[in-house]
């Protein structure tokens, strides 16, 4: 059915987002040892009840990456950490925007809303502290399909002429001109 198909699609999308969030967190955690700066970023989603949007989380991550690069314990290490953190921030922003679009359009709103929970990573300190949990799932209601439109009626056949006076000799008069011809014929007789 349509409801089962929508639920299946929602589960697959939420699984995809969960894996993407986990990959972003792992990338940020791996880059934490390269720089010695402090900071971190969390993935917030205003669509799942969080107070911050994806763009704010991305901006925070870029700022954190810059601080990590400035305070890094080596030129190569700091730039590597900044690049990895920036890539993780971009992935987090894309995740938040896609999830927001799906929730706003009603796709996957009721299945596993917590799959996109924030994944933060503290640069230089080791493991980062993750952000918030997702909001509870709401039941998705589907609207019924619209009824089909009725077929158009067939057009009537043309009246035949008898070849003498040009008036209709059979059939139902469908047009005002038929009446006009008969009236005119009667007035001339």
From Swiss-Prot:
One of its GO terms (cellular component) is extracellular region. The keyword Cell inner membrane does not apply. It comes from the Eukaryota. Disulfide bonds: none annotated. Keywords: Secreted. Its main location: secreted. Residues 127-160 have a biased composition (Gly residues). Component of the organic matrix of calcified shell layers like nacre and prisms. Residues 127-170 are annotated as: Disordered. It is found in: Secreted. This is Alanine and glycine-rich protein. It comes from Mytilus californianus (California mussel).
């Amino acid at each position: 059915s349509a409801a089962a198909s929508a639920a299946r699609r929602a589960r697959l999308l939420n699984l995809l987002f969960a894996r993407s969030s986990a990959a972003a967190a792992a990338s940020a955690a791996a880059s934490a040892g390269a720089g010695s700066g402090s900071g971190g970023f969390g993935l917030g989603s205003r669509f799942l009840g969080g107070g911050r949007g994806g763009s704010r989380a991305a901006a925070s991550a870029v700022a954190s990456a810059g601080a990590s690069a400035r305070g890094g314990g080596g030129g190569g290490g700091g730039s590597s950490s900044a690049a990895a953190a920036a890539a993780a921030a971009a992935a987090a922003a894309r995740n938040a925007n896609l999830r927001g679009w799906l929730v706003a359009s009603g796709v996957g709103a009721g299945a596993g809303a917590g799959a996109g929970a924030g994944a933060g990573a503290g640069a230089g300190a080791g493991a980062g502290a993750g952000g918030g949990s997702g909001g509870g799932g709401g039941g998705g209601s589907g609207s019924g399909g619209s009824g089909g439109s009725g077929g158009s009626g067939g057009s009537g056949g043309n009246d035949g002429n008898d070849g003498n006076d040009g008036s209709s000799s059979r059939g139902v008069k469908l047009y005002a001109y038929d009446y006009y011809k008969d009236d005119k014929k009667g007035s001339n007789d």
